[in-house]
């Protein structure tokens, strides 16, 4: 133990020039002066330091408040944008649905009008065919009648005398007139 004490004592006697060591002389090291200076620094520096810290704290709080306000504004704008997006999406969906239903409606209208046009064309065709058939039947009747009349006249001319011939012609002309009135 004596060795340890001797080493501390010898440290206190080392010369201070150019070397490191402990100076145990209280008056030489000015611990009183140092404590006074430190006390003054702490007393006056505490106010300055607390002012600096308070200012820094206020700036941080203001920045946080501004950030919160900006965040709130951004959230509000985001909600408005989402609301507009939902509205636009619903309108787009309505336009899409309405567009599809409009297309289907137009398609059905086109199909219906095409069927009506085809029906009308079929009716016109049938009427034209019936008219042409009736006309052909009338022409055939007229030709058959004319041939029958010529044949009858030829037979009558060869078999009858002039007076009977004239009476038969008059009767046939009368019948022709009646037939013509019936057909017209």
From Swiss-Prot:
It holds the Pfam family ATP-synt_B. The keyword Membrane applies. InterPro entries: ATP_synth_b/b'su_bac/chlpt. Keywords: ATP synthesis, CF(0), Chloroplast, Hydrogen ion transport, Ion transport, Membrane, Plastid, Thylakoid, Transmembrane, Transmembrane helix, Transport. It is a single-pass membrane protein. Belongs to the ATPase B chain family. This is ATP synthase subunit b, chloroplastic.
């Amino acid at each position: 133990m004596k060795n340890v004490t001797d080493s501390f004592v010898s440290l206190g006697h080392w010369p201070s020039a150019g070397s490191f060591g402990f100076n145990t002389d209280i008056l030489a090291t000015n611990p009183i002066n140092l404590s006074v200076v430190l006390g003054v620094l702490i007393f006056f520096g505490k106010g300055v330091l607390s002012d600096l810290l308070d200012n820094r704290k206020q700036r941080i709080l203001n920045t946080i408040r501004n950030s919160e306000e900006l965040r709130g504004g951004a959230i509000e704008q985001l909600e408005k944008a989402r609301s507009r997006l939902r509205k636009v999406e619903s309108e787009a969906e309505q336009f899409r649905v309405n567009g599809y239903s409009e297309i289907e409606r137009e398609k059905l209208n086109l199909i219906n009008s095409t069927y009506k046009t085809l029906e009308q064309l079929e009716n016109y065709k049938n009427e034209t065919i019936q008219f042409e058939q009736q006309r052909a039947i009338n022409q055939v009747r007229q030709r058959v009648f004319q041939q029958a009349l010529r044949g009858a006249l030829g037979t009558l001319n060869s078999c009858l005398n002039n007076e009977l011939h004239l009476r038969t012609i008059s009767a046939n002309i009368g019948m022709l007139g009646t037939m013509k009135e019936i057909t017209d």
